[in-house]
């Protein structure tokens, strides 16, 4: 398949500019350079014209500003992350990284404008739709892209993510446990828009929402304090982990809206569908509970971080938060013994889909599906679990065998 790119000389401006863009290099333009020229051309068509006074004061047009940022500030931003591991010459330039992050921001624009996400890999189609003269929001869309890049400038990106996220349990329980890599910005620059195994995103929708939370925070640091963000990003992370079936492209606009509300207010906005309803209720209950129990924030975070709970603590209950260490020690034991010990107390099974589920000896997903059931249906399971946790300060296989034998 042979592709041809059409560049309007009129849009590109003077012939000397065209010469610089094409001939001085002695080689054809890359796809990224075509995209850049196309985008700048779109901006020139829609940008406000400068007055003579503005020109005399040295002010730049919007297209000039964006073009300069692409060439300098935004290139410097992406340069440390230019190697996406393709093993090609593309690893020495930031073209792919720029386009992938640009597409992330474009997806946000689609959602905010209530437009279905463009599933096309054609960046030129996306550029025309969002920044063409026929789009009444084109100027604001350009500003959204500009803010989306600018917010990362002069930021220690690794430290930002590392201050609130981790991939494993640490002695700082307030950090959210997430999948690798912790630096979601870099992951987006390398993987966003790529599809694997049919329609599965290489950069999952949950990571899209989590990255947007950081972008939103960086753009609103004047109203969201650092400590507030640390608590609120945990809420967002919990909601993402508890919303497997709600993380859909046609629901992304609602997920973004709820994320913004959480970051702005530290609570849940009710009245519309977004994340999983059970997890939304639980996160609101935690907010109210922490108002009266602020000293227990660390232990709550520790319980949320347990791999079998992943933010959903309703099977233990906020009123039983002091049993957190016992819960950890219980599930450090042989899970087959944990299952048998629970069954000696009662039937703790849950109806999951079409069958009744109990915990497996070696499959963590069975436990997770039980523990994430809605609060009402969990009552008996919770009663049995708390009864077991009350029988020992610390659990071992020997302790569980004694409980089973008794």
Spell out what each predicted region is:
Residues 1-406:
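Flexible coil/loop and intrinsically disordered segments
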């Amino acid at each position: 398949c042979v592709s041809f790119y059409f560049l309007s000389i009129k849009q590109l401006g003077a012939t000397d500019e065209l010469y610089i863009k094409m001939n001085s290099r002695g080689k054809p333009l890359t796809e990224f350079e075509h995209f850049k020229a196309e985008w700048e051309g779109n901006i020139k068509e829609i940008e406000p014209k400068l007055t003579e006074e503005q020109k005399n004061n040295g002010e730049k047009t919007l297209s000039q500003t964006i073009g300069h940022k692409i060439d300098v500030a935004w290139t410097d931003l992406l340069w440390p992350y230019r190697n996406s591991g393709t093993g090609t010459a593309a690893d020495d330039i930031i073209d792919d990284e720029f386009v992938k992050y640009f597409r992330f921001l474009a997806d946000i624009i689609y959602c905010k404008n209530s437009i279905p996400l463009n599933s096309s890999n054609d960046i030129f189609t996306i550029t025309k739709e969002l920044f063409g003269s026929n789009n009444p929001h084109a100027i604001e869309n350009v500003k959204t892209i500009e803010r989306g890049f600018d917010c990362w400038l002069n930021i220690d990106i690794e430290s930002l993510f590392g201050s609130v996220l981790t991939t494993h349990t640490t002695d700082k329980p307030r950090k959210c446990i997430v999948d690798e890599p912790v630096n979601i910005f870099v992951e987006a620059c390398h993987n966003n828009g790529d599809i694997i195994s049919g329609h599965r995103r290489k950069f999952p929708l949950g990571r899209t929402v989590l990255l947007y939370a950081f972008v939103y925070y960086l753009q609103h640091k004047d109203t969201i304090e650092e400590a507030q963000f640390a608590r609120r990003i945990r809420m967002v992370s919990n909601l993402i982990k508890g919303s497997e079936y709600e993380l859909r492209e046609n629901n992304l606009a609602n997920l973004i809206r709820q994320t913004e509300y959480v970051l702005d207010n530290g609570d849940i906005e009710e009245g519309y569908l977004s994340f999983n309803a059970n997890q939304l209720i639980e996160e609101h209950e935690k907010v109210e509970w922490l108002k009266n129990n602020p000293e227990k924030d660390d232990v709550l975070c520790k319980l949320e971080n347990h791999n079998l709970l992943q933010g959903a603590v309703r099977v233990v209950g906020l009123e039983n938060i002091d049993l957190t260490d016992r819960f950890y020690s219980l599930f450090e034991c042989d899970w087959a013994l944990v299952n048998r010990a629970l069954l000696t107390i009662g039937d703790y099974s849950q109806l999951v889909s079409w069958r009744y589920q109990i915990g497996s000896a070696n499959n963590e997903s069975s436990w997770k599906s039980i523990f994430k059931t809605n609060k009402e249906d969990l009552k008996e399971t919770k009663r049995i679990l708390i009864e077991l946790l009350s029988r020992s300060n610390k659990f071992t296989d020997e302790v569980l065998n004694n409980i089973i034998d008794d």
